[in-house]
Amino acid sequence: MDFINIEKKWQEFWWKNKSFEPKDDFNLPKKYILSMLPYPSGEIHMGHVRNYTIGDALARYYRLHHYNVLHPMGFDSFGMPAENAAIKHGIHPKTWTYENIENMQKEFEALGFSFSKNREFATSDPDYTKFEQRFFIDLWEKGLIYRKKAMLNWCPNDKTVLANEQVIDGRCWRCDTEVIQKELYQYYLKITNYAEELLKDLEALEDHWPSQVLIMQKNWIGKSSGLQFGFKIADECLKACNGIQEIEVFTTRADTIYGVTYIAIAPEHPLVEHAIKQVSQEVSKMIKAILNTTQRERALEKKGAFLGIYAIHPLTKQKIPVWVANFALANYGSGALMGVPACDERDFEFANLYHIPIKVITQSPQNLPHTKEEVLKNSGEWSDLSSSVAREQIIAYFEKENLGKRVINYRLQDWGVSRQRYWGAPIPMIHCNHCGIVPETQLPVTLPEDIVIDGEGNPLEKHASWKFTQCPKCHKNALRETDTMDTFIQSSWYFLRYTTPKNQRENQAFDQNYLKYFMPVDTYIGGIEHAILHLLYARFFTKALRDLGYLHLDEPFKQLITQGMVLKNGAKMSKSKGNVVSPKEILKKYGADAARLFILFAAPPAKELEWNDSALEGAHRFIKRLYDKANAINPTTSKPEFKEVSLNEAQKLGRKKVYEALKKSHEIFNKAESAYSFNTLIASCMEALNALSAQNNERILCEGYFVLLQILEPIIPHTAWELSERLFKRENFKPIAIDEDALMEDFMTLGLTINGKRRAELKVNINASKEEIIVLAKKELEKYLENASVKKEIYVPNKLVNFVIA
């Protein structure tokens, strides 16, 4: 079998005939199958191969079954690696990026992926940037984007800001450098405006998205209901607080309010800036040290300092000390927490560390802290009530007395989208001393190409002819915004643009007719690591564009498949570990079909896949067997018709196994509960080939191959196209119905019981009479019945025979 030339032959045929372009007929049933677009790093890895093989199998199956399939591919082509390559290799980021895209396109073709070429683009293309900048301006004008100065996550290595979601355990999501805090101006997208809708709409995705992803998004949004109220600054401390009269806090445990013995505020809280002037030099030094620590460092060890001021408890009127604590977060709630050591692990640990008093407010004084809800004591009029009852009554009291109010809080923060780098989509805003921040009118704002990338700061800041411009409103001298957009903006709407052919999107982001027809994406495939980054942002962006009038849908992805990682020797493949498998080498040695077959057979999509060279060789041998056995079949110019009546057992088994595989194929591709277990489908195909190989009835072989090649076409397309063309001609190769007669069993297995207790099984002909079955059953149970008196014989058709004995 010359797999290299066979694969090359059909790849050329597919591209020449535009075999994978969707039709413009909106009356056809459609399927939009999409794998997450890759970053053009230069060469694809086995993780790419797995992701795109899964998607391609789905796309090819639905095409074969007469769906109008959109299966596009593009490139998420802005980002820091291109700048790093520019520094390392002395090559322009644009040149590096587009050379890599060209190389990856060839690799995709070599694997036989059936992508639509007429939808392809890179997110760094100017015509893509143009509409992204238009969206940015529309969002700004609608009030969904704002700009403010704040302490931000800063990656010292990449020299850029990171969103909260891009900080993983205190480190940069891309380069793993420890993140620090830095105060900068930043543009924010108001994702918090959509927190409730993002949370509520997760319900519609249940049974369609992995539960783990839904839980991760729910936890990240972090909805909580509680009491918001204030501790008034003690009169003698007001001067030190420079006009700040109250510390506002939020708590989900209003029932523990009588247990407050301190207030913890974030180092960034506005109160600190004023009160720090009156504390000792040692305390001031400690507070400043906390300010300079990373979130990861703050999580490792609790630290704090007494700020020297007190606030008044709203119920007891006692003075409560105010502490700066590194576990209080400025970007959550009001940046202030009430410390209840008797009822909270963190508060208890902090109180013990700094010898802060602990007030017990539950009936059980032992084994502090009491984090579970209990009956209260030392809680005023709410003593002797359960925590849940007291909580509701205390909130009602605060609202009645205008001391506070019930509020909903979310852990989710607004999405900071400014990045201090060159290779990104320019933010289309102008800074004018007379007009303020003004949107650019000439789009797209493109990047200058005559830049120097040396790794020191943002190159756009140093590019005078690009940076200095005129205000589009008053035409006076102004400054262009030098920050570029977070690349997650590009990946938040690319799936919408794919819907529209290239020749119809020059003057529009996407065509409404194509959009309404193809959206939402029917099946979306990518790694679970995108659960609270890309997937959450894409859901938000879809809703925001809907509210701008661009869309008429709420959710972009109907079904989600999160494929597991590809491992070797139990670890994720990486160059540093020396366990990388090169797709190029695999294609050269075994071919694309063997690689695809192994990928789908080795593990279900959601599970991790352990690389196995011998299993890959086994996949290669299976394809060769399939090919070689086909040589025994005389080509036919029409669909094979099965007319045999009298068959032996081997022939019946051959037909049965083939149609069992066909039935499983429909289940695997069409039923979500199957979890796309291609491994079980391929195992069925292997059984079917074994059964066909055991007999030489040419009609059965011909019929069997007609069915088997249809099942395998989505998995090993080159081999399937080659054999189906040779044996049947492609124009005759239409989906075949399941022959239910072939699945009928000649025998049935009955349970044999005595007085209801199972003793044996009996395999009998399915047409056997009751009398024949009773005789055979008695013979099978002879040793149990020889000395017994049978009182009654009960036959339950197709299930069991029971003998009642004395």
Swiss-Prot record:
Q: Where in the cell is it found?
A: Cytoplasm
Q: Which family does it belong to?
A: Belongs to the class-I aminoacyl-tRNA synthetase family.
Q: Which Gene3D superfamilies match?
A: 3.10.20.590, HUPs, Isoleucyl-tRNA Synthetase, Domain 1
User: What's the domain of life for this entry?
Assistant: Bacteria
What is the protein's given name?
Leucine--tRNA ligase
Protein's UniProt keywords contain Nucleotide-binding = yes
The Gene Ontology biological process terms listed for this entry are: leucyl-tRNA aminoacylation
Q: What is catalysed by this protein?
A: tRNA(Leu) + L-leucine + ATP = L-leucyl-tRNA(Leu) + AMP + diphosphate
Query: Lineage of the source organism?
Result: Bacteria, Pseudomonadati, Campylobacterota, Epsilonproteobacteria, Campylobacterales
Protein source organism: Helicobacter pylori (strain ATCC 700392 / 26695) (Campylobacter pylori)
The answer on whether this UniProt entry bears the keyword ATP-binding reads: yes
